[in-house]
Amino acid sequence: MIVDFLSRDVGEENFGALIESYIIHNALRDKVLQMKNISLFCPNFYEEINFVEDGVEVFLNNKNILKSKLLLACDGRFSRLRDKFQIHTTTKNYEQIAIVFNIKHQKPHENIAWEKFLPGGPLAILPLKNQHHSSIVWIAPKLDSQAIIELDQENFMHQLHKKTENCVGEIEIISEKFSYPLIMVAAKKFYHEKMLLVGDAACGVHPIAGQGLNLGLESIKILQELIKQYFLSGLEINSQILIENYNKKAQKSARKMVIATDVLNSLFESQSLAIGLARDLGLGLVNRLPKLKKFFIKNAGGF
């Protein structure tokens, strides 16, 4: 069964953009270097962090001491800052591995992203800027993943062609393959003293819906709006009320995404005939009911 989501269904020219991470990193770094009110301390690292009455002090290995109203922990799903201050987490190991690489292909992708839900796990074909280049995210059971990665080129390509079902024609791999385990990690609270968890440090979800970066950006948006609101009202941007408001709003946003991605993965991973029939019925309804389809598009795309 094929379910298609089109941007015109919600009156938009497109859903958004698929951008390789190194491009985003380089653009952000260039922007930071242009900002006169931002100082970059890299590759320095912290040796000690103290919370004081009016904020936080960070002692760096180069003997600099940074003082701030707030400290943002943006150090990823396996955050050392989160662990340092003993913020407990809920975790779920999906016993799956994501294998990621770029391909060159015969047919133009026409800016269409495909996600194929197949026995053993989904495979996503994500269009890049070049019409004949795409990124592959191949999700496989942990038990099978090493055998897949270690396949010789001929057998790996044979398996890949079977999974893509010729939707982009002949394929050539044009990058290194890398893999990572799929583990959901959600902090039980998104703060400690004057430190806030942001992005994957707060919550990292299953990539099945491609919403990990968007969830991180949403936490930044929530914090930015709260800081602006409190600053314009003449209130301290590190007040306990702001911190608790951020925790409440960001956790609510993250909780919805954790549930959605977890349920979606379970539905397509299940071998149960009853669940399979219910899943196919649900997908059929999405295709036949425009309002239901719009609901999914708007929630995924942030429209």
Question: What residues fall within each predicted segment?
Answer:
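Conserved N-terminal helical subregion
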Residues: M1-K84, K92-I97
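Short, solvent-exposed loop/helix junctions and linker helices
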Residues: A17-Y22, E150, L217, S272
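A general structural signal for well-ordered alpha-helical segments in protein cores
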Residues: S21-H25, R29, Q96, V100, ...
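Structural motif
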Residues: V52, P119, L128, Y191-H192
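Conserved FAD-binding catalytic core of PHBH/FMO-like flavoproteins
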Residues: N64, L70-E170, S175-K177
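FAD/FMN-dependent oxidoreductases across multiple families
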Residues: Q146-F231, I237-Q240
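C-terminal helical "tail/cap" subdomain of flavin- and related membrane-associated enzymes
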Residues: E225-F303
